[in-house]
Amino acid sequence: MAYEIVYESESKRYRSDCASVLTKTCEILKSKNIIAQFSLVGSGAKNLITRNGNGPYDLDYNLVVIKADERYRKDLRLLKDTVRNALNKAERKDFFSDAMDSRSCLTTLLHFNDSPNVEFSFDVAILTKNRNGNYMRLIHNKNAFCFGYDQYTWNEVPKSHDVKEKADAIKAEGLWQEARDR
């Protein structure tokens, strides 16, 4: 099978559904003293979504924690579980399955017609910013041996501060395609 582009007319509904679920998730988190905002990233943000033939495709989102009570900052497992539970609660009336905890994100699947086949999924990475302005991604090291199993850590995304401003400057100079080709 060859990869094909998913047309905007098809992906628009899923983007809308995901935005609705993530808006509800942020409202639930706010009631638990976690202020967060989400953004579509990756191929979905660029309208370049692909899939293998008629197979499923996914969208990727970042959920940036702007402010949270100290208990969440000290207990990253609690933070990820709270986000996962809020996501599950927000999607209860939809067709999505409960979010699954993977290493660097929460994954939610969509099934149709009581079929085991996955039609669509979306991934939510949990991030925050450090003092340098770089993003930090919440990682669940399920098999980390050095500090025991089930370690939760923040992993810095290098040179991630002011990413939008950097991209805008490259585009303004007419060098965007050259940067993409590298």
Give the location of each predicted region.
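Short, charged/polar micro-motifs that form catalytic or ligand-binding hotspots
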Residues: 8-15, 69-73, 77
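Glycine-rich loops and low-complexity Gly/Arg-rich segments
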Residues: 61-66, 86-89, 147-153
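Conserved catalytic core of two-metal-ion nucleotidyltransferases
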Residues: 29-33, 77-132
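Active-site nucleotide-donor binding segment shared across nucleotidyl transfer reactions
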Residues: 27-59, 63-73
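Predominantly extracellular/lumenal beta-strand repeat domains
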Residues: 48, 66, 78-81, 90, ...
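Helical scaffold of the NTase/Pol beta-like nucleotidyltransferase catalytic core
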Residues: 1-40
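Short C-terminal domain-edge/linker segments immediately following a structured domain
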Residues: 68-74, 92-95, 152-161
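Right-hand nucleic-acid polymerase module
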Residues: 102-105, 115-182
